[in-house]
Amino acid sequence: MMARPVDPQRSPDPTFRSSTRHSGKLEPMEATAHLLRKQCPSRLNSPAWEASGLHWSSLDSPVGSMQALRPSAQHSWSPEPSVVPDQAWEDTALHQKKLCPLSLTSLPREAAVNFSYRSQTLLQEAQVLQGSPELLPRSPKPSGLQRLAPEEATALPLRRLCHLSLMEKDLGTTAHPRGFPELSHKSTAAASSRQSRPRVRSASLPPRTRLPSGSQAPSAAHPKRLSDLLLTSRAAAPGWRSPDPRSRLAAPPLGSTTLPSTWTAPQSRLTARPSRSPEPQIRESEQRDPQLRRKQQRWKEPLMPRREEKYPLRGTDPLPPGQPQRIPLPGQPLQPQPILTPGQPQKIPTPGQHQPILTPGHSQPIPTPGQPLPPQPIPTPGRPLTPQPIPTPGRPLTPQPIQMPGRPLRLPPPLRLLRPGQPMSPQLRQTQGLPLPQPLLPPGQPKSAGRPLQPLPPGPDARSISDPPAPRSRLPIRLLRGLLARLPGGASPRAAAAAACTTMKGWPAATMTPAETSPTMGPPDASAGFSIGEIAAAESPSATYSATFSCKPSGAASVDLRVPSPKPRALSRSRRYPWRRSADRCAKKPWRSGPRSAQRRNAVSSSTNNSRTKRWATCVRTACCF
């Protein structure tokens, strides 16, 4: 029949209902146990009664007892089902300590009297509730015996409170005579009366000016002892502290119904679960954070690879710069595959380097190590030069290093030995030399040992193949800039052609150039296969000259022209660019969303505005991304 112990801060009612239920049936001893569990009621039975030999709640108009009860209820009292009575009293005393000075000094007389009213009513009602005959109210008779000085009448209940707790502390026991089961029973009743808080005040009960039929002796004797106690109490105060302060440290959370042992138990910081309280969590921030950080990482990282992946999907398969090229189709003989032997680190001869394009039949003159590197990348016959990264006019011919960012262009001696006919030897070269990324060819294009010219996928693909993936972002812009600078001068034939077409077409040069060069877009996608001249030609039939000039697929053109058209660069860029931009946008999204969510949280301000803006932003972002 344990009533749940009540938490200090919580108003006692709910629990007490249960106690009310039981208290009628309690055996004397049980009653005592019960009292031990709830400090309040037991606080009633205190040495004061031993003095009077009678039970406060019944004798002295219940005020005293009620007084004792109520404040204790209001101030938290420790609910621990104190198996050790000592401890329990300790706690009570602790709270009392807070109460005493206050109530003694500040509580006005009226308040005390008021209490007396209320408490009397309560007691009476409780006794009726209990219905046990012994408890029927001893009607307080105005006994002339009892004329305490009014101030004493006021002060007494309050003082009694303090002193009771003191007494209990000193005695070290529950301070009610174990011998009087009846008393303990009644005190229980009193407690329950307080718990079932009837709002009714019976007018019948007189204010406490007189004590109910009890001898005056107890109260007369009482004040002396009380005052002593009060005096000592101030000195003793430090002693009241509960024996192990740790138990006091965690106050139970406000609404909690758990047993104190739960909230008092030492807690590892990890066990504490996040609370809804505004205070910062007990749990360490590191514990929450790493996941967040990791998540964001996951967000950001894939985006980088995805960038390159998407672009290969365009039908070319440039490998990330450092990576050795993947082996072409399984069906292809592997040996031919390393057509670019390690020696040709610049895998794809840039068109600008004049490399003799070997027809399939030719044995490829493999550059001797002494050969300067730029010429060195001898285009394998199978590969039209177009795919090779065409050095844009501004660029030195060393694009190959760009191609293989990690690898210095160094010519392994074995390289020169390789002949197109010797399939095995190329393979060996490859193994002997650095593992070169093999020329980036679309996987579909087998590099046959003979290296017959393999029809490459359409020019744009080839071009993008040879594009070094790495520096892509800044390079094209630089190149375009260089190209534009060249345009007026017509330094390179290709540039001249471009200038010619732009002027011939009647497009203002300005419009054309921005279109080609807009860093974001690159040349319009329509132009994918063609050099500037070709674009122009396609767009206006009148531009025949430019068309004739540059209409051959730019690959061929670049072969002849010393300066390869920059366009392919730009072009691959253009096709690359729209999605690349969107990827950037997406990549930024998580970062933006971090602060954004914070704003969302913080801006309790104009909700409409915020939401509208937010919604708009979201729409835009989504639309642009995809």
From Swiss-Prot:
Biased composition (Polar residues): 186-195, 255-270, 600-611
Biased composition (Basic residues): 570-579
Keyword Translocase: no
Keyword Membrane annotated: yes
Extent of Low complexity compositional bias: 337-346, 416-435
Outcome recorded upon mutating residue 201 to H: In a colorectal cancer sample; somatic mutation
Alphabetic keyword roster: Cell membrane, Cell projection, Cushing syndrome, Disease variant, Membrane
Region (Disordered): 1-29, 173-223, 236-473, 556-612
Any GO BP annotation: cognition
Subcellular location field: Cell membrane; Cell projection, Ruffle
Predominant localisation class: membrane
Pro residues bias: start-end ranges: 366-399, 436-445
Biased composition (Basic and acidic residues): 281-312
Superkingdom of the organism of origin: Eukaryota
Membrane topology: Peripheral membrane protein
GO cellular component: cytosol; membrane; plasma membrane; ruffle
Note: This protein is produced by a bicistronic gene which also produces guanine nucleotide-binding protein G(s) subunit alpha from an overlapping reading frame.
Noted disease: GNAS hyperfunction: This condition is characterized by increased trauma-related bleeding tendency, prolonged bleeding time, brachydactyly and intellectual disability. Both the XLas isoforms and the ALEX protein are mutated which strongly reduces the interaction between them and this may allow unimpeded activation of the XLas isoforms.
Subunit composition and interactions: Interacts with the N-terminal region of the XLas isoforms of guanine nucleotide-binding protein G(s) subunit alpha.
Role: May inhibit the adenylyl cyclase-stimulating activity of guanine nucleotide-binding protein G(s) subunit alpha which is produced from the same locus in a different open reading frame.
UniProt record similarity statement: Belongs to the ALEX family.
Protein name (record): Protein ALEX
Species for this entry: Homo sapiens (Human)
Lineage: Eukaryota, Metazoa, Chordata, Craniata, Vertebrata
